[in-house]
A protein has these predicted regions:
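Secreted/extracellular small peptides and ectodomain modules produced from precursors
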Residues: 10-13, 17, 41, 92, ...
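Short, surface-exposed loop/turn motifs at beta-strand boundaries within globular domains
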Residues: 34-38, 50
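N-terminal V-set
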Residues: 46-81, 119-120
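Disulfide-stabilized cysteine-rich extracellular repeat microdomains
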Residues: 10, 36, 62, 103-106, ...
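Short beta-strand segments of immunoglobulin-like
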Residues: 27-34, 45-46, 150-152
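Ligand-binding face of N-terminal immunoglobulin V-set domains in extracellular IgSF glycoproteins
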Residues: 38-44, 81-135
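N-terminal Sec-dependent signal peptide, specifically the hydrophobic helical h-region
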Residues: 1-31
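Flexible inter-domain hinge/linker segments at boundaries of tandem extracellular adhesion modules
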Residues: 14-26, 58-63, 118, 126-152
Length: 153
């Protein structure tokens, strides 16, 4: 029956798109740096929508940085230390610059963009797409380790 076959194909296509979406090209990189230095967590947009320049970076537990056009939000503890410049974002570069690294900054960071989608009968809607995951490691330089040990002795 043609109707049953059509429904079956539709379901198969939906499952394939769900699986491909879940396995899409989300890369995980590792970045490391010493305490007090600056780390750049790489990120690049696949396409740039200059009408709604949006990027969000977060850890598993909190929003680190968010930009919507000129407006920005810096998460608690990250104030004055994080940025994705509007100019770079217009070029499709969404790398997070994290200054004055702290040991507590170590962890996995994820970047998200907003994508507009339009259905056949639905109005345009937006959904967030994961762009990248970055594992940040922060270490204490050997000379600072010696200074800490000497101070506690």
């Amino acid at each position: 029956n043609l109707e049953t076959m059509t429904k079956f194909l539709y379901i198969c296509i939906m499952w394939i798109s769900v699986c491909v979406d879940a396995l899409s090209a989300v890369f995980q990189f590792s970045v490391s740096g010493p305490v007090g230095s600056t780390a750049v967590l790489p990120c690049e947009l696949t396409s740039v929508d200059t009408d709604t320049l949006y990027i969000r970076w977060n850890t598993e537990s909190e929003i680190v940085f968010e930009r919507l056009g000129e407006k920005t939000f810096q998460g608690e503890g990250y104030e004055g230390r994080v940025d994705v410049s509007e100019e770079e974002l217009r070029k499709g570069k969404c790398s997070l610059v994290l200054r004055n690294l702290r040991l507590t900054d170590a962890g996995v960071y994820a970047s998200y963009e907003t994508a507009r989608t339009a259905g056949q009968s639905l109005p345009i809607s937006q959904k967030e797409l994961l762009i990248s995951r970055i594992k940040l490691s922060v270490n204490v330089p050997p000379n600072k380790t010696r200074m800490i040990a000497a101070a506690s002795a």
